[in-house]
């Protein structure tokens, strides 16, 4: 057993080191010094995380590990209580990987670069803190910590309509946070003279069914905004349409996954009876979301908004996996979270680098881009294939596991399972339609651009490096998905056996 506070260091390091970014001395190119300082912090964080997980984490142990507990607020029983298990280790590693690459991708940012990189590191701490929290108050504070950086990144470095998008984002997420705070307060104050928000204590707490449903619904609204789940998704296309692509990488790769993680970590683990009641509705909403978002994506002229709606559609598979209440379905949902974290981040990165070169976002104005930009065309096509679940890539395995999870669920009758499976199949057909249509309208044809030197228009070493770094795990998970599933399978079995299979 390790007594070193690994998780505290991992959570606090990015924002602490980011705070000193305003005092970093530099000579010559200020932006280059700040960018590489931030990248070094991210790399150090990844090394510490990898070391702690490799040498102090037992993957076959479903219990909470590396847990720490420090008295935080003495009046109440509130603690700084981080801890990890098989559910949280994957998202934490994903956070470090995507944040590092997003920092590397942010080289074109030159205005207020100190503040920009500090906000990215602050988001890093907030996201890792959310995934490693074992106290509801700590979870809520970390959940809120990453909202303000996103708002500032969007409002200061976004597009022409950035203020509208930033305001819409903060109104939606702040509204969801009110419901989250109400749920946290209600669970902490219920049935005890001394309030407690410890996950382990709350897991053994029983509530009247009506009250448990109220708690569940409050948390669900907060997660529905963040994930997003229809009809609370409308902030996402506007945000992705205006945000800088490094911010989009963090949104699509990490922030959207926090809602699904919270749905499993809090709603499934702490409110099992309410989840059993709500799970059919999650499956229904997930099925509708797959079709609705895929159909809406096909009608988008803005190619960044088209990718954003594809993220909403893929979230539907995660909802179905969570609602299936099976080992297979829940493991598939977790795999989909990791898989789409890579794929979504890569697509927005390539969309941003394409926009930097041609300064066009509407598909009907594009065409023939494959001729001057063959490298970007190749990478964009590869990740589009991953998004439409091409066999051999991570998206295919994740959707297939979710599919098997719902058809093997003992909770649902045969006819509902057939209908849901049919809807999922339609979604799998619609995804290639909007993905391949986007590729055709962007890259094929004979339009010519007034660019004096096509060589400089194509992808450079930075774009190739970032794309390859993301593509390798996409293919690796597609070929050997047990690399991810082995982390979560024991914890998933423990959750379902403790709460649903008694």
UniProtKB/Swiss-Prot annotation:
Signal peptide residue numbers: none
Residues that span the membrane, as ranges: 4-24, 37-57, 86-106, 113-131, 136-156, 169-189, 210-230, 244-264, 274-294, 307-327, 332-352, 388-408, 418-438, 464-484
Bilayer topology annotation: Multi-pass membrane protein
Protein name according to UniProt: NAD(P)H-quinone oxidoreductase chain 4, chloroplastic
Record-listed E.C. numbers: 7.1.1.-
One MF annotation (Gene Ontology) recorded for this entry: ubiquinone binding
Lineage: Eukaryota, Viridiplantae, Streptophyta, Embryophyta, Tracheophyta
Similarity comment text for this entry: Belongs to the complex I subunit 4 family.
Intrachain S-S bonds: none
Entry superkingdom: Eukaryota
UniProt KW keywords: Chloroplast, Membrane, NAD, NADP, Plastid, Plastoquinone, Quinone, Thylakoid, Translocase, Transmembrane, Transmembrane helix
InterPro entries, per database record: NADH_Q_OxRdtase_chain4, NADH_Q_OxRdtase_chainM/4, NADH_UbQ_OxRdtase, ND/Mrp_TM
Catalytic reaction(s) noted: a plastoquinone + NADH + (n+1) H(+)(in) = a plastoquinol + NAD(+) + n H(+)(out); a plastoquinone + NADPH + (n+1) H(+)(in) = a plastoquinol + NADP(+) + n H(+)(out)
NCBIfam families per the UniProt record, alphabetical: NDH_I_M
GO CC term, one of those recorded: chloroplast thylakoid membrane
BP GO terms, sorted: ATP synthesis coupled electron transport; electron transport coupled proton transport
Pfam families cross-referenced by the UniProt entry: Proton_antipo_M
Protein's gene: ndhD
Subcellular localization(s) per the UniProt record: Plastid, Chloroplast thylakoid membrane
